[in-house]
Amino acid sequence: MAQWQWQQEHEAKRRIEALVFEHRCELEDDGLDPDEIDRRCAEFRAQLNTTAAPPPAVVDEVSQPLPRLLEQLLSPDDRAAVEQAAVVCRRRYPRLNGEGDVTGSKAHAITYLHRDGYFGRDHGPLLKKITGAMARDWRGPPLTVRCVEHHVYTEGGGLVLEDHRDLGSSLSLSVLLSDQYKGGAFTTTEDGVTTAHVPRVGDGVLFASETVHNVSTIESGERRALVVELWTGPATTHDRSK
């Protein structure tokens, strides 16, 4: 087998196992019996293997390099709408405030804004503005919204998992909503080189989802951000997997 073929198969298996792990976390949060969790995960893995797609494409990085900064993507009114959406979703969907996300913690709260199609339905023009900016230079197959998430990092919180990637997605965007904090540097790592991005409030960092990215630990204050992922799979209305 050629090296590139092996790499493609390896990446496909890695993506599937990452999705299965996320699914297992969600089932554990729902309080299911361990045997039932194993059974459902086996079914989910079989389904993913049956419908496995080629690795997600990304934009032409020669003409439009990634990561890149989308300056002042969100206006003050846009940011206020996002914050209000987070308030609504925390009240309306209390069980779906990111409990199934392996990166969440008491100091890193994640709220799904796309649950039951809420954000696209109640904030359609804003979502279209965001996804349009993300996919402006897209050269691959049609993209759909995988997730719209509101993140709040408080002291001690961060995204420090080694080799963290948004597996299965094609494009990811992180928009800074606040700047009253210390620490919390947003970085991407490619080919062993780590780059620190310094967005202003309202700026978004757009990057290929398979890029390793992290948020350093918050030393004080509160870091708020909007995260949107696009992929070639079906639109989700529950969490990141379904």
Where would I find each of the regions flagged by the language model?
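Generic preference for well-ordered alpha-helical elements
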Residues: 13, 17-20, 34, 38-41, ...
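Short, flexible/disordered secondary-structure transition segments
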Residues: 30-34, 38-39, 93-97, 140, ...
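Catalytic core of non-heme Fe(II) oxygenases with the double-stranded beta-helix
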Residues: 128-242
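RS-domain-like, Ser/Arg/Lys-enriched low-complexity regulatory segments of eukaryotic spliceosome
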Residues: 1-61
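Short amphipathic alpha-helical segments embedded in low-complexity Lys/Glu-rich regions
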Residues: 37-45, 98-105, 144, 191
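Amphipathic alpha-helical interaction motifs in eukaryotic regulatory proteins
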Residues: 24, 28, 38, 42-45, ...
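Non-heme Fe(II)/2-oxoglutarate
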Residues: 58-140
